[in-house]
Amino acid sequence: MDRLEMMDFTKFKFLSGLNASPDGSRVVFTVHTMDHENNRYLSNLFLQSSDGTVKQLTDTNEEKASIWLNENALLFPSSRDKDVKDRKEAKHPLTCFYRLKLDSMDVSREFELPLDVSRIEALGNDRYLLLASFDKRMGNTWRITKEDLEKKVEELKEENDYEVLDEIPFWSNGEGFTNKRRTRLFLFDSTKNEITPLTDEFTNVESIQLHPSLGKALLITSSFIDKMSLSNDLHQLDLLSLKLEKISPIEDFLYDFAGYLKDMIVFVGRTKKNYGINENPKIYLTEDEGLSYVKLHDLKHDVYNSVGSDCRYGEGRSFKVDDDYLYFVSTLGHFSNLYRIGLDGILERITAEEGSVDDFDVNGDSVFIIALRQLKLQELYSVKNRDEDQLTSFNSDSLKDKTLSLPEAMVFHNDDVELTGWVMKPAGFDDRKYYPAILNIHGGPKTVYGTVYFHEMQYWANKGFFVFFMNPRGSDGKGDKFADIRGKYGTIDYDDLMIFTDKVLDSYPNIDRFRVGVTGGSYGGYMTNWIIGHTNRFRAAVSQRSIANWTSFFGTSDIGYYFAEDQNTATPWNNHRKLWEHSPLKYADQVQTPTLFIHSEEDYRCWLVEGIQMYTALKYHGVVSKLVMFKGENHDLSRSGKPKHRVRRLKEITEWFERYLR
């Protein structure tokens, strides 16, 4: 068996964008690969047919999504043509759509729109619903000529040196500055080449679900001018009259999803009253006027996939209504599965394997998922009666003949709460030797570690480290009470992590307890900062995309003004002392641990100022420390950053631990 190398992950393939055909016999999806030399990702469409064959549909490396127009035709956006690519690079609002005929493989340009379209839905009769970005500075780009649009783009270049902000949030991680920019709903008539806006310039459309036979659509929206609230609304659109009506059954509510289930509307959301913004949602039913509602199911777990991995790229579906059921992905324990629920309120689990369901689609009896299973990378599966049939082998050779470390579970208790963690032994483990170890802490905090493939941890195991990780209180998968650490950051979660570390060291005597390091990102970075200010037991630390100071986080993060208040039950004005008590920066004068900080310049979730503050504090107090900043990257560097940057990140972390733990 060969040792796993750092660069191996650049050869992995990542799957996303499942879309089943109208008859359910085939499914189209996107395969992403890394082009390390040119520091980019390549994305192309593939088709899985009922006869078991997999066919590549595009090869221009520009296609990430598609919809079915009929059984023989797909519609997809692309910048494959030079004129389109040039205008996109010149910052023109533009999306060009192409039609692909599956029988002949002919591709033709269908239409182009002076909008940056994020989603398209075909209504029939050459009419489409669009979700597209609207920038108030650009104005109504769909109403002016190409010449006038070019002039507008040139005029705005004069504004490149300035950002005028008059609302919060004013930026968003992965998007940049978002002031007075919204996702609006449009109707496009391709026969008339006519675009009609259906929502105003202050409203964000977060999701849309169609019911073509009823001639209606459901929209989840949020409107704001100065400050975005934590509630949103449910609207219904009449596709004939284009009348948009608010039908929110519950006010001051956070709607996650709404769709048509038979002659009822099923919606998923949370009141936030008992457990704040991270409260697990419930499932409800209402009629199409939204005058009353009933709770269909009192879910005890969340409705998203929160299983961590660094081997995904692209987006996945979380909800879909098909025939008599609402299908959704949910995390229970340390893995996610696909579930469904009908009007009778009975909850059924559709998948049975442990791991991670990263995307799915359903059409009648056909169920398709993209999943991580055991220590295998993503593949496409069909599901029937909970049995999974692997349909693709894109990654079958990626880990072939590679040495992998199987995570060994460790269940223990703290404060009468059951907790789970895992330990990975070094490759080529010899019980006569002693090894260094790394504690890895996940982000969130409401996410989970599981037993799926995680490249960085497998790589460290192959470099001769024990690697151990757990789901402390605050994590997902075990209900609201377990996940609720509001006002308790750095207390019970810290205790869980330290007791876990004790138990790992006691259970694995081959770990050299004087050569143990700690790392983590986001919340895991916060906990790394907290840990080094409260104990000197770790010989080295790497803090990634972290939080150091809740007060600065409150005023700079794209989620700061509501997340900091919710998670600390305090603001800088009503209880600044509490924010400071839970800020790692307060304890920086107690740090002795050599610490590396990893931070992206465009991380607007945990802004660069967080890493800089902690780094400066350690330098001020004479602690060995180093800060590596990544230009052009955001909070998702470790998951979707440019290939060369992801390699450099892992190299910096590994070399730091090699230096201080060997």
Regions found by a protein language model. Name each.
Residues 32, 133, 440-444, 600:
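Glycine-rich His-Gly loop
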Residues 1-14, 47-64, 88-93, 98-118, ...:
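Multi-bladed beta-propeller domains
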Residues 7-43, 206:
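Beta-strand-rich domains and repeat architectures in extracellular enzymes and scaffolds
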Residues 17-19, 158, 164-166, 171-172, ...:
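Non-catalytic accessory segments flanking enzyme active sites
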Residues 19-26, 65-73, 120-126, 208-216, ...:
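Blade-terminus and WD-like Trp-Asp/Gly-His loop motifs, strongest in beta-propeller folds
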Residues 394-514, 521, 555:
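Cap/lid segment of the alpha/beta-hydrolase catalytic domain
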Residues 472-662:
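Active-site-proximal cap/loop segments of hydrolase catalytic domains
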Residues 31-44, 58-64, 78-98, 113-116, ...:
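A flexible loop/linker signature enriched in serine peptidases of the S9 family
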